[in-house]
Amino acid sequence: MSPAPAILALRRVYNFCLLVDEAHGFMALGKSGRGSFEWWQDCGYDCPLQEVDIMTGTMSKSLCCIGGFVSANGVYAAELERQRTLQHQNGAETLSTAVLVRILSLINKPKLIKERMTALGRKASFVADCLAQAGCDILSSYGSPVVCFPVGTIQQASRFHEEAMERGFAVACGVPPATPLWSCRVRVCIFATTSWEDILDLINMIIKVSCKLQLKGITATVFTPDTLPKQYLDDPSIAEQSIKSDASICSYVESLSKTYPGGDLEAKAPLNLAQSQEAVEASVKAFSKYGLGPSSARWFYGTFDVFIALERRLAKLYPSLQRHSGRCRAMLGTDAHTMMLSLLSACANPYTSGVMNILLIPTTASLAVQDGADLNRPRAETKIIYYEKLDNLVAKLRELPIDASKLHLTLYLQTTSHDGSSILDLPATVQMINSGMNDPNQLKGLKLILDDSGGLGKVGPHHLGYLDLMERDHGVSFLNQSLGIKLAPKTEIIVTGSFFNAFGQQGGYIISSASFIEVHTVSSKSFVFSTPPTPIQAALSGKVLEILSRGTC
């Protein structure tokens, strides 16, 4: 736990801006779920939230949703309003209605929150007490719902994870560089809704696995049900408040439907009314089957079949890409803006030893693209070049170092203009690259990022985007023919786009060769650390793509 009392004492002396990130504390710490500062207040310290200038948090970890929030005091509140306006102007996505209703339905129930926070504190403290009694060195703050303890080397951490999974428990491991080489950690997350029976099984599993791996200091101990703390009956006023809160939200939604009537459902281009209804029904079925879905990174919880189905459909969406790249795969993102930022950040990393990676980005690229390219610290092996128009690209290329055998180009291209009036001429662009290089044959490799955010849902015979249009006009060999015999084998093509721009609901995607996607699931920070899309989003996007693939009316 961060030393909030000491930080506030320093702030009162030096008057600095204090930003508190409650990504792990919101609805997880404090008697009313307000985070670490409230946790310290509960412990008797003077930590008023009013002295925090900016606070951030997420909805995923405790509200089982996607999205996050920023709140600010004083002068920073005005800047926050300005940033919000800029976000919308730069195409930031809005949260799905189902997610907003979920959030409102939970935070408007203070009695339920207080009861859950009390239960969470009791369960987390019980786990820590039992493990400490067995000799485990608890590294996390007392009462924290994330219980952390050391297990030794990377090999021991890996074996601990494997043994826990075999017993039906998922644990998170912390390894170098986040931890010392000899002191890897295991983190166990406790939930207020976790049953006491599961809590007991978890404790005994940790001790049993620790003894099997011969972790230092752990003694064989078995905790039985009679060691559990006293249970209390539910307060009936909690259910009463929850019912009233839900009724209020339902009434609000009904009033909106009367204020903005539309025959229940309107057609959403490029779909007709019947097809729009079919897509909505698919998302409703997904909600009935999965709820709002998981609230942690994909690798932690595994995956759902609805995600796999959408990824497989995307991977086979463009025959020309398969003809060029061989087996393709796809990956999903919660929002296209963050996914694009993370993609450019990953592509801005050094290519390989002794090779300079040159990123060529138009000045008209979105803020996410520019921020992603500039996110990493400057390195000698990477250079970012911004150009105004494709006509200027040749001049930029001719300014590159003469030793082309040690160059790799990463070129970001928008498949359509912002207003949709022009379409990318890929063959001409490739020709410019060839003419701009001193010796194209010495180029180490080329990576083309085709941003189809303005193409999907708008262009092509099936409204499936840029490659859909090119395949109709030039056939499935379009990409290989555009690149040419010499350049095609050493070119990686990445197609990315936005479900938000195409269909009006959150989400983004990346399609490329299987080898690239498998690496990018590790190099993409947005994939590793962000909450996945909801099953509702995946089902809706998948159904719309299915409808478009078979042809619209």
Curated annotation (Swiss-Prot):
Key words, A-Z: Endoplasmic reticulum, Glycoprotein, Signal, Transferase
A GO molecular-function descriptor: pyridoxal phosphate binding
EC top class named in words: transferase
Phenotype caused by lack of the gene: Impairs the production of fumonisins.
Subcellular location: Endoplasmic reticulum
Induction line: Expression correlates with fumonisin production. Expression is positively regulated by the fumonisin gene cluster-specific transcription regulator FUM21.
Pathway involvement of the protein, from the record: Mycotoxin biosynthesis
Entry GO terms, CC: endoplasmic reticulum; membrane
Sugar-modified residues: N480
Its EC number(s): 2.3.1.-
Broad class of the protein's primary localization: endoplasmic reticulum
Names of required cofactors: pyridoxal 5'-phosphate
Gene3D superfamilies for the chain: Aspartate Aminotransferase, domain 1, Type I PLP-dependent aspartate aminotransferase-like (Major domain)
Signal peptide: 1-25
Pfam families registered for this protein in UniProt: Aminotran_1_2
Any one of the GO BP annotations: fumonisin biosynthetic process
Role noted for this protein: Aminotransferase; part of the gene cluster that mediates the biosynthesis of fumonisins B1 (FB1), B2 (FB2), B3 (FB3), and B4 (FB4), which are carcinogenic mycotoxins.
Family affiliation: Belongs to the class-II pyridoxal-phosphate-dependent aminotransferase family. BioF subfamily.
Listed name of the protein: Aminotransferase FUM8
Species name: Gibberella moniliformis (strain M3125 / FGSC 7600) (Maize ear and stalk rot fungus)
